Amino acid sequence: MTILSDVKALGQQIWLDNLSRSLVQSGELAQMLKQGVCGVTSNPAIFQKAFAGDALYADEVAALKQQDLSPKQRYETMAVADVRAACGICLAEHESTGGKTGFVSLEVSPELSKDAQGTVEEARRLYAAIGCKNAMIKVPATDAGIDALETLVSDGISVNLTLLFSRVQTLKAYAAYARGIAKRLAAGQSVAHIHVVASFFISRVDGALDTTLPDHLKGKIAIALAKAAYQDWEQYFTTPEFAALEAQGANRVQLLWASTGVKNPAYPDTLYVDNLIGAHTVNTVPDATLKAFIDHGTAKATLTEGVEEAQAQLAETAALGIDVETLANRLQEDGLKQFEEAFEKLLAPLV
């Protein structure tokens, strides 16, 4: 038994926020699953680093450059292969929990973030190309992405809705998910296999606020926001309206804590893992944070502790003239830009 097993017993899955060919082929990912990791997330920045730093791609890049393909098609060929291989490694985990864990995420192109129809078409194509039941398609939580979520859920595709910073936007996502489920049920189709995670980004909130907050609030607001978002989640998914969908096989969306590596070296390296453990959630962690948590983390149901204190901290932040919803919109735009830049960088050597 490891600390990851203890976390799983508390109802939270720990996923790895990393993917590369070396990770898959070396047996390292399989070893992480034995330790208790339950899934994998990727994004354009992760693949950009993998392609740049992993020698195992060199031969395939050279071969793909001999073919009449666009840089994006070359990228997708390699990324889909990696995700398919990771899905294979995670399949036993997926099947052992009746399809509730063991997912691997691949993101749609960042250039589609404001294009709902384009997102739907690419998500369908990527999902079919991967061809694995434990694949999740990652879609940014813009208004267009939330529209796409509804359609993809009604298609029967599992989705990782990413770049959430806003409680308001997260609630909109839950409603879109419920509409997609209702449409699928109305068509007489099964919904039990569909899983959606709402990826709520953590450390970037503190990174943006810590320069403007008084000392006693520094390093506190991201966790406070997550605790408030979890209260919202509990309220939404215990309504009679959702209970009616649940009775027909629908799963609850799960909050996934993302960006949980600590950016400020003054903070404990397991800050955003230790303090965000709760039932029906996921935490996707980079390698260094995973190692730190296994070494000296604490497995305790902390997400429902100190909720009143969290609300007070958010109220004090608002009283200082800081609107966390306005901040959320800015952080999402910044995140989209970062992924677009990483995607351009990723494609450049594939021309």
From Swiss-Prot:
* Origin superkingdom: Bacteria
Query: What does the UniProt entry say about where the protein is found?
Result: Cytoplasm
CDD domains in the record, alphabetically?
Answer: Transaldolase_like
Which species is this UniProt entry from?
Neisseria meningitidis serogroup C (strain 053442)
Q: Which InterPro entries match?
A: Aldolase_TIM, TAL/FSA, Transaldolase_2, Transaldolase_AS
A single GO CC term, please? cytoplasm
Family, as annotated: Belongs to the transaldolase family. Type 2 subfamily.
**EC number, UniProt record:** 2.2.1.2
Q: Which reaction does it catalyse?
A: D-sedoheptulose 7-phosphate + D-glyceraldehyde 3-phosphate = D-erythrose 4-phosphate + beta-D-fructose 6-phosphate
Which GO biological process entries does UniProt record here? carbohydrate metabolic process; pentose-phosphate shunt
Q: Output the Gene Ontology terms for molecular function.
A: transaldolase activity
Know the name of this protein?
Transaldolase
